[in-house]
């Protein structure tokens, strides 16, 4: 594919989109999602891996809570990947990731993912480009492995916010008592590296697109949630699942 230029992609909903109408539609979509997730769990022939990437304050946590929070917790798993531990660093970079690959019947959500190992690591020059491109090839092979050998369907979302909106949200973490627990002064340091992160994300989109990325405008939470929920709903509907019948002895 041609190289994606994030600076040329809008971070907001099209002007003609109505906020309240979209929220009303989302209620219906979430009801469909609930039924489809139950069907996925009952049939247990497929699994779904949802990868969520984005800059700090892009709304990853809120998206997971508002779109997936009302689904049956028996069939939905969420893993947030932080900085690797000493044990994890002693293995290949995908070791800790593969441990959370979804079993058939499950939806697995990655809050950050294997892509951190070719993003922040490059921005801070912890790895060189040669290592990064080898890792990208490994990621492509790993995603193909899940698709081909476990009927895992993969959706990859990049939550696309503007630097101004990021700054507003980071500032709110200082001012709002309900959000102060999220505050981390390092987030401001990382925000200063915005252009470097955009460059690395764009390179990642180009070289890790065998499973395509969805670039989701994320300045407005209502629109972001609608786009992600709709994409997940459509993916599950496309599996043409059926409830199993009575088991014969």
Indicate where each model-derived feature is located.
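Charged, amphipathic alpha-helical linker segments immediately N-terminal to NTP-binding catalytic cores
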Residues: 1-30
């Amino acid at each position: 594919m041609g190289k994606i230029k994030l600076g040329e992609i809008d971070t907001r909903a099209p002007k003609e989109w109505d906020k309240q109408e979209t929220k009303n539609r989302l209620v219906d979509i979430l009801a469909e999602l609930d039924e489809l997730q139950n069907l996925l769990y009952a049939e247990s022939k497929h699994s779904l891996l949802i990868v969520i990437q984005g800059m700090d304050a892009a709304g990853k946590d809120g998206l997971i809570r508002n779109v997936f929070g009302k689904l049956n917790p028996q069939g939905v798993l969420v893993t947030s990947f932080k900085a690797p531990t000493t044990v994890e660093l002693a293995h290949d970079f995908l070791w800790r990731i593969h441990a959370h690959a979804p079993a058939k019947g499950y939806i697995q959500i990655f809050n950050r993912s294997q892509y951190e190992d070719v993003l922040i690591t490059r921005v801070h020059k912890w790895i060189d480009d040669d290592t990064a491109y080898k890792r990208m090839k490994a990621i492509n092979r790993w995603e193909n492995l899940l698709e081909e050998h476990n009927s895992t369907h993969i959706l990859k979302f990049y939550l696309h916010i503007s630097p101004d909106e990021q700054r507003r949200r980071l500032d709110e973490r200082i001012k709002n008592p309900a959000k102060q627990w999220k505050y981390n002064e390092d987030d401001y340091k990382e925000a200063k590296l915005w252009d470097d992160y955009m460059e690395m994300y764009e390179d990642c989109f180009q070289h890790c697109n065998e499973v395509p990325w969805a670039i989701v405008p994320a300045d407005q939470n209502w629109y972001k949630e609608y786009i992600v929920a709709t994409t997940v709903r459509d993916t599950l509907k496309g599996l043409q699942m059926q409830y199993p019948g009575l088991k014969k002895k």
